[in-house]
From Swiss-Prot:
Record-given protein name: Trimethyllysine dioxygenase, mitochondrial
GO biological process: one example: carnitine biosynthetic process
Organism: Homo sapiens (Human)
The UniProt record lists the keyword Iron: yes
Presequence positions on this chain: 1-15
Organism taxonomic ancestry: Eukaryota, Metazoa, Chordata, Craniata, Vertebrata
InterPro entries to which the protein is assigned, alphabetical: AlphaKG_dependent_hydroxylases (IPR050411), GBBH-like_N (IPR010376), GBBH-like_N_sf (IPR038492), TauD-like_sf (IPR042098), TauD/TfdA-like (IPR003819), Trimethyllysine_dOase (IPR012776)
Subcellular location, record wording: Mitochondrion matrix
Protein's gene: TMLHE
Gene3D superfamilies with a match to the protein in the record: 3.30.2020.30, Clavaminate synthase-like
């Protein structure tokens, strides 16, 4: 499973937001009794946990905190946190990794309470806290999500009654900002209310959490239905669900929308949790989910309108997952901007179309559609790596402004406020 269904884990939500997955302190079985006599395991016991470890020819094996871990000896030497190997003030490695013997093995290993000591052939001593090894081992990372999320359809989101944050609280207090970011990280969308309906105030709001990402559309964009750019967004037509800037090699992470004025009808905004839809595909057709996560596609944006001349190309699969824990972190879905499919062999193309159709059916289910009317004073933030957006057609004069934010900076702000991101 590539995510935690937090809607069933409300009692652990605060722990997840502060520090990730909580590993229970369960006693370990007697591994020694399960192994041939020729294998020698070292055992220690604390008040709550037992530890067993063995030195192999090419790696070190550790059983602790309900986790079986294996560490390459070069890895253990490379990650030494001694003063000569790691600068704790700058949090940067001082050791020259290329200087480590690729055949290195420790001369001795000993355990003192919950600290392992490795003595290397040159006499250097590396020490590791057992909990640090659990947290940073490959096996430990497989059990941990990078970012906790609550997946939703329209009913789930509406029943959650996720509160908006007032503009003044957002701008002037860390409490308001943290509340906003917590909602945004969990659901992929969040609202700020009572914002003065101007481009300048919208910009000030965005800069509270991130640097604004300047693109071919400028720093802050402001548009009506005048088709001033070669994009369907600059019309009154309906837009099907999609993610933006799929034609960038790294799509923009967050987008901000503020409707400054609308003198007419229609124009509601459509929001769909792409991760919820992808989870349905994973449950119903796992082989199709896997195909969508492996086949790279081109998306492109060709513009030749007035003084705007651009040809952007981005390449990547529809679904992007972390390989070690299978956590989905990015959906790249835009049928408007998908380029010619020439990166897929003929014997895979039809299977890809089938998988794409399965995902599209889930994305288009009416129960997955959350519709909202944007209005002056209400600013919408969207996780463009997760939530698809669209709109219904509209009449009359409509002004929107907004921008893209750098994802790294938004997540940086969240971490500095103590959130898991």
């Amino acid at each position: 499973m590539w995510y935690h269904r937090l809607s069933h884990l409300h009692s652990r939500l605060q722990d997840l937001l502060k520090g990730g997955v909580i590993y229970p302190a369960l006693p370990q079985p007697n591994f020694k009794s399960l192994l041939p006599l020729a294998v020698h395991w070292h055992h220690t016991a604390s008040k709550s946990l037992t530890c067993a470890w063995q030195q192999h020819e090419d790696h070190f094996e550790l059983k602790y905190a309900n986790t079986v871990m294996r560490f390459d000896y070069v890895w253990l030497r490379d990650h030494c946190r001694s003063a000569s190997c790691y600068n704790s003030k700058t949090h940067q490695r001082s050791l020259d990794t290329a200087s480590v013997d690729l055949c290195i093995k420790p001369k001795t290993i000993r355990l003192d309470e919950t600290t392992l000591f490795f003595t290397w052939p040159d006499g250097h001593v590396t020490k590791y806290d057992l909990n640090w090894l659990v947290k940073n081992s490959y096996e430990g990372q497989k059990q941990k999500v990078i970012q906790p999320r609550i997946l939703w359809n329209a009913e789930i989101y509406q029943q959650a009654q996720v509160p908006s944050v007032d503009c003044q609280s957002f701008l002037e207090t860390n409490e308001g900002l943290k509340k906003f970011l917590q909602n945004f990280l969990l659901y992929g969308i969040a609202f700020v209310e009572n914002v003065p309906p101007t481009q300048e105030h919208t910009e000030k709001l965005a800069e509270r959490i991130s640097l604004i990402r300047e693109t071919i559309y400028g720093r802050m964009w402001y548009f009506t239905s005048d088709f001033s750019r070669g994009d369907t967004a600059y019309t009154k037509l309906a837009l099907d669900r999609h993610t933006d800037t799929t034609y960038f090699q790294e799509p923009c992470g967050i987008q901000v929308f503020h409707c400054l004025k609308h003198e007419g009808t229609g124009g509601r905004t459509l929001l769909v949790d792409g991760f919820y839809a992808a989870e349905q595909v994973l449950q119903k057709a796992p082989e199709e989910f896997e195909l969508l996560s492996k086949v790279p596609l081109k998306h492109e944006y060709i513009e030749d309108v007035g003084e705007c001349h651009n040809h952007m190309i981005g390449i990547g699969p529809v679904l992007n997952i972390y390989p070690w824990n299978k956590e989905l972190y990015l959906i790249r879905y835009n049928n408007y901007d998908r380029a010619v499919i020439n990166t897929v062999p003929y014997d895979v193309v039809h299977r890809w179309y089938t998988a794409h159709r399965t995902l599209t059916i889930e994305l288009r289910r009416p129960e997955n559609e959350f519709w909202v009317k944007l209005k002056p004073g209400r600013v919408l933030f969207i996780d463009n790596w997760r939530v698809l957006h669209g709109r219904e057609c509209f009449t009359g004069y409509r002004q929107l402004c907004g921008c893209y934010l750098t994802r790294d900076d938004v997540l940086n702000t969240a971490r500095l406020l103590g959130l898991q991101a």
